[in-house]
Structure formats: C-alpha cells, structure tokens
Amino acid sequence: MNEPLLLFRGIEKTYAETNILRNVDISLYPGKCILLSGNNGSGKTTLLKIIAGLETPSRAEIELSGKSHSWKSAIRSIRREIIYLHQQPYLLSGTVESNVSYGLRFTHLNRKQLRESVKEALEWAGLADVAKHQAKTLSGGVQQRVAFTRAWILKPKVLLLDEPMANMDIESRQQACDLLKRMKSEGMSIVITSHDMNIFDGLIDSHCSLSDGKLD
C-alpha cells in the first residue's frame, strides 16, 4: 500500500466531562475511501470536523513526512488540502455555474482561466446542461452533485462527506457514487459517514465503526 497522506493519532474529544472520542487513530491514503459508521451521537461528525480543522480536539497528533506534530501546529499547513461537506449541500443563491466557480474566485486564476476551469468541471460532472439553472431549484441529488463538483474543482487531497447520500433516490445515489469513484481514481482520499454501506456500490475500500468513542 502507498504511504498515507495523513495520519491522525490519539484523537480525543471531551464535552462536559463526556469522552466523545477516545484515543482514535485514523490513516488516510491516496485513492482510497473509508466508510465510517456508528450510531447517532457516536462522534462521527466530530471526528470529521477535527480532521478538517473545523473543531479543536482535546488532544491529537498528526504525522507528516514521518514526523509527529501536535494537531494545532500541523493543521494550519494542511487545512487547505481538506474539504468537509455536510449532509446538506448548502448551495449559494445563483446558478450552478456560479456555485461551482465560487471557490476559484479566491485563487490566482484570471477570468478566462476561471471560465475554462468551470466549464471543464461541469462537463466532468455531467452538469453542463444545467449550468445556467438556479442551483436551489434542482433536485436534492443534483444539488449534491453540484456540491461535490464545487469541492472537486479546488483539487483537495482529502474529501470528508457527512451522510452524503441521505434522502437521495437510487438513481441519484448511483450518479453521486460514480462521481466519487472518479475522484478516488484521481488519487483523492475520501472519508464517508453513513449508516448503510450497501449504498456505495464498489466505492468503499475499508470500513471502520465508532462505538463508545473508539474506532474499531
């Protein structure tokens, strides 16, 4: 197996003296997808947010290039390489095209390069025919694909998805899985939380379960 992109070790999180996460280790590999399951309140979302740098752990270390660093000192250098997506797409008001282009507006790309990148992304995701549609008027499955594409265009190394297939019909799930498989084939590391691993046709490489704050 390839060297891991990131190793998170000894993750702990305590809320009001309750141990939500207890000494959790997780390794993220390029081109691999982890399914993270567990009951509601087991800490799945908390773990994803700690990996993404959106929530501070009580304790954690990150291993980079064979050296261990505290979470606080290391997360700043890797935060831009990680994208976390909530169960809800949280699209902006405006067209599909403007949603997909949003993150690129804060990069060095000029207008021509931005337009070309957005066009490529929309074609890649099979969204070119709805590019000018108002994003929030589309079905939930299409909105989620827009959110995936908005993430993909920024070329993160790690994509964290919190219950991404909730409330999708079978066809929408298959289309979303197809996009995620393509991301994985390009070397992206993906972590998905879900209660049902049977809906991720051929996508999952490994399965971990959170219970009593520990990862099995």
Regions from the language model: what does each represent?
Residues A52:
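Helix-to-loop junction immediately C-terminal to a conserved catalytic motif
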Residues E61-S77:
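ABC ATPase NBD Q-loop/coupling interface
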Residues K112-V130:
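Conserved ABC ATPase "signature" region
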Residues Q134-L138, V142:
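Conserved ABC ATPase signature
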Residues L159-D162:
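Catalytic Walker B motif of ABC-type/P-loop ATPase nucleotide-binding domains
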Residues D169:
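ABC-family nucleotide-binding domains
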Residues S194-H195:
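H-loop/switch region of ABC-family ATPase nucleotide-binding domains
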